[in-house]
């Protein structure tokens, strides 16, 4: 079966937005007008086709990115293939957004015409900047009370530091929003309300908008001709570029991320969606318009590029794993080069394992079709892969490549979790492992000391949703504990302990004497053991017993029972008995010596210190710094990033719980932060006493 669409007719794009900017409604309308879904689903009644997880229907926020294939005839009547990736808009799911941005070629950024650039818009915009994604802007909800297109244009500049090139002007606003003025063709499009927005009339620009339209068209042309010296010279000599030339130049500027074409409409009222689809064809890149993906040769580690061509060796990136109730586990992959055929065996170069390709599916929001082949530029869902997780590369085993890995932040919050009924323990383990395979920012481990299952993630909402999904998808109900900090203990001074263990009551007894020096390990956090026995006061075969005895109590320190770090122990002398001594006797003696020694060597409590980075608009810098100081934080410095300020600090993890809520309210939700573990540091004595009371 040959390729149906040329690769230049593909558009792989996503829709990125703040929570309530109308992303799902816009996607729905796109699916409706491109003829894939017949009844328009409304988020208000929770039936949108893209929002297919139950929870999303309840919360009205989109959590998992689903990939949908649909088709659109451009203004030249030629059919194009759209692969639309739905992205979440909630701050705890920015990992999902990063993941989708990684495999997109372009994006539509939605704004709410009433709110303009909102906090999450800033976050997602910065992530798209990181991956250099070409974008268009759609100012949605023009029918809403308080809608103001011109203010939104201004906010794109002031808050995002980005250049918007206005392509359309609204005709009316709020309940009077009738249509748009196309600044390229200088015509007005007025939608017919009675046709659900499927039909519109092209008319002359109303007299009262004529002057404004002329002014904005001039700005549009000035931005366009900047893209080409020849066009610029002709323009300066008084020659106007043609309509085709304007579109070609705007396309060039968009793909090179020099500026962002801006449109307006109301997806809910079905106005402005079709011109937006034409703009996707006109201005967003196809897979061959963007730089080839870079990777390294899996054998030689030499850098290589893979071009978006069917003739190149097959390479693809797994960017999403989801559980489908009918098919089981589905791995969504973006094919960057080559052709994928059902039944072939591929190399997972990150894991060093082989995978056989069984079922291949083309996904619509919640229906699916089986396919036999897929090509460069396609996004496919593969059923039944065993080893592959998010961010892995799958490729031709004869030409192995590792495409650039995605980076996922370390989880920052952990809680203990247990099933409500003992019998569900195994089921819970399976559920958590399955969820961890889907989501690299979520981790599961067992606490060695308490035997409890600990789950860790990106934030409190993130873990709430995990617990919720466990209940819905795996029918396991769980109780969760309070968020916990992983403290440690160490020693600060040198102490010499001489300890004799003696138990002689008829028959064979037990005898061992040890003299051990305990001191801080100068080389770091590990445990170091040395024996300086000369002249056989402790026979060689008993020395390992001394080391084992000390190691067995390192997991529980003297202050509050936390694991100990950075201890050095040196066995300097001892004594034994021909009959009563044994390895076990020396183990017991060493254990007791360490318990005594840890107390005398100035035991100290340590806490994890996190490296915190807060990105905030300038007006909140003072509040952010004051708040971090109040959390025992040490400010390391600040720098400008675009129109925002980055504040770096070291803060104890214990003082960072609920930080996200505080930061949101402090900055009206416009600042965001990341944090990761940096090092351990002694706990101030007042705080240490409280911890000791709590855990001792």
UniProtKB/Swiss-Prot annotation:
The keyword rRNA processing is assigned to this record: no
Where in or outside the cell?
Cytoplasm
Give the InterPro entries listed for this entry.
Answer: EFG_II, EFG_III, EFG_III/V, EFG_IV, EFG_V, EFG_V-like, EFTu-like_2, G_TR_CS
A UniProt-annotated Pfam family:
EFG_C
Q: Where does GTP bind?
A: 17-24, 86-90, 140-143
| Any one cellular-component term (Gene Ontology) | cytoplasm
Give the record's keywords alphabetically.
Cytoplasm, Elongation factor, GTP-binding, Nucleotide-binding, Protein biosynthesis
Indicate where this protein is primarily found: cytoplasm
Q: GO:BP terms for this protein?
A: ribosome disassembly
Q: Name one GO molecular function term.
A: translation elongation factor activity
Purpose: Catalyzes the GTP-dependent ribosomal translocation step during translation elongation. During this step, the ribosome changes from the pre-translocational (PRE) to the post-translocational (POST) state as the newly formed A-site-bound peptidyl-tRNA and P-site-bound deacylated tRNA move to the P and E sites, respectively. Catalyzes the coordinated movement of the two tRNA molecules, the mRNA and conformational changes in the ribosome.
Report the family membership: Belongs to the TRAFAC class translation factor GTPase superfamily. Classic translation factor GTPase family. EF-G/EF-2 subfamily.
User: Can you name this protein?
Assistant: Elongation factor G
| Gene source species | Chelativorans sp. (strain BNC1)
* Top-level taxonomy: Bacteria, Pseudomonadati, Pseudomonadota, Alphaproteobacteria, Hyphomicrobiales
């Amino acid at each position: 079966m040959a390729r149906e669409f040329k690769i230049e007719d593909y558009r792989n794009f996503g829709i990125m937005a703040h929570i309530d900017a109308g992303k799902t409604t816009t996607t729905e309308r796109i699916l409706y007008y491109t003829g894939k879904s017949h009844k328009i689903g409304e988020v208000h009644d929770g039936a949108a086709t893209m929002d297919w997880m139950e929870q999303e229907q309840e919360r009205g926020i989109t959590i998992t990115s689903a990939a949908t294939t649909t088709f659109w005839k451009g203004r030249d009547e030629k059919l194009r293939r759209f692969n639309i990736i739905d992205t979440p808009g909630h701050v705890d799911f920015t990992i999902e957004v990063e993941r989708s941005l990684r495999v997109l070629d372009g994006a539509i950024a939605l704004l709410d015409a009433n709110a303009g650039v909102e906090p999450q818009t800033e976050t997602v915009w910065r992530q798209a900047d990181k991956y250099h994604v070409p974008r268009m802007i759609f100012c949605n909800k023009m029918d809403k009370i308080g809608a103001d297109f011109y203010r939104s244009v201004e906010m794109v500049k002031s808050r995002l530091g980005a250049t918007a090139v206005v392509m359309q002007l609204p005709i009316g606003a709020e309940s009077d929003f009738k249509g748009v003025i196309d600044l390229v063709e200088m015509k007005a499009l007025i939608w017919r309300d009675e046709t659900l927005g499927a039909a519109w009339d092209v008319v002359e620009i109303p007299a009262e908008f004529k002057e404004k339209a002329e002014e904005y068209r001039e700005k549009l042309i000035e931005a366009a001709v900047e893209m080409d010296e020849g066009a610029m010279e002709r323009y300066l000599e008084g020659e106007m570029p043609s309509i085709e030339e304007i579109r070609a130049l705007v396309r060039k500027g968009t793909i090179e991320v020099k500026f962002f074409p801006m449109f307006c409409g109301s997806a809910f009222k079905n106005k402005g969606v079709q011109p937006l689809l034409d703009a996707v064809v006109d201005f967003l890149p196809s897979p061959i318009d963007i730089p080839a993906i870079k990777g390294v040769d899996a054998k030689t580690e030499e850098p290589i590029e893979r071009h978006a061509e069917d003739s190149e060796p097959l390479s693809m990136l797994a960017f999403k794993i989801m559980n489908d109730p009918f098919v089981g586990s589905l791995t969504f992959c973006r094919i960057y080069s080559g052709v994928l055929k059902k039944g072939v065996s591929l190399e997972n170069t990150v894991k060093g394992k082989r995978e056989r390709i069984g079922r291949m599916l083309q996904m619509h929001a919640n229906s699916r079709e089986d396919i036999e082949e897929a090509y460069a530029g396609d996004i496919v869902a593969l059923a039944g892969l065993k080893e592959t997780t998010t961010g892995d590369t799958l490729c031709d085993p004869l030409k192995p490549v590792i495409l650039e890995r995605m980076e996922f932040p370390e989880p920052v919050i952990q809680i203990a979790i247990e099933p409500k009924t003992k019998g569900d323990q195994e089921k819970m383990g399976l559920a958590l492992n399955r969820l961890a395979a889907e989501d690299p920012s979520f981790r599961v481990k067992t606490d060695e000391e308490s035997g409890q299952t600990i789950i860790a993630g990106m934030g409190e909402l993130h873990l709430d949703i995990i617990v919720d999904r466990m209940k819905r998808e795996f029918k396991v109900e769980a109780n969760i504990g309070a968020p916990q900090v992983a403290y440690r203990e160490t020693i600060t001074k040198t102490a010499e302990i001489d300890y004799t263990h003696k138990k002689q009551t008829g028959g064979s007894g037990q005898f061992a004497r040890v003299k051990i020096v305990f001191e801080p390990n100068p080389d770091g956090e590990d445990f170091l053991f040395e024996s300086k026995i000369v002249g056989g006061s402790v026979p060689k075969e008993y020395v390992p017993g001394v080391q084992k005895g000390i190691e067995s109590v390192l997991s529980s320190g003297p202050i509050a029972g936390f694991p100990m770090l950075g201890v050095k122990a040196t066995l300097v002398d001892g004594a034994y008995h021909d009959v009563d001594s044994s390895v076990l006797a020396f183990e017991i003696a060493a254990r007791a010596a360490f318990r005594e020694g840890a107390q005398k060597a100035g035991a100290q409590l340590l806490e994890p210190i996190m490296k915190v980075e807060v990105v905030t608009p300038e007006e909140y810098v003072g509040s952010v710094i004051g708040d971090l100081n109040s959390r025992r934080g040490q400010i390391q410095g600040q720098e400008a990033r675009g129109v925002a300020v980055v504040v770096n600090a070291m803060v104890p993890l214990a003082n960072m719980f609920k930080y996200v809520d505080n930061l949101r309210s402090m900055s009206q939700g416009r600042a965001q932060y990341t944090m990761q573990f940096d090092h351990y540091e002694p706990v101030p004595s007042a705080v240490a006493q409280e911890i000791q009371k709590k855990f001792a």
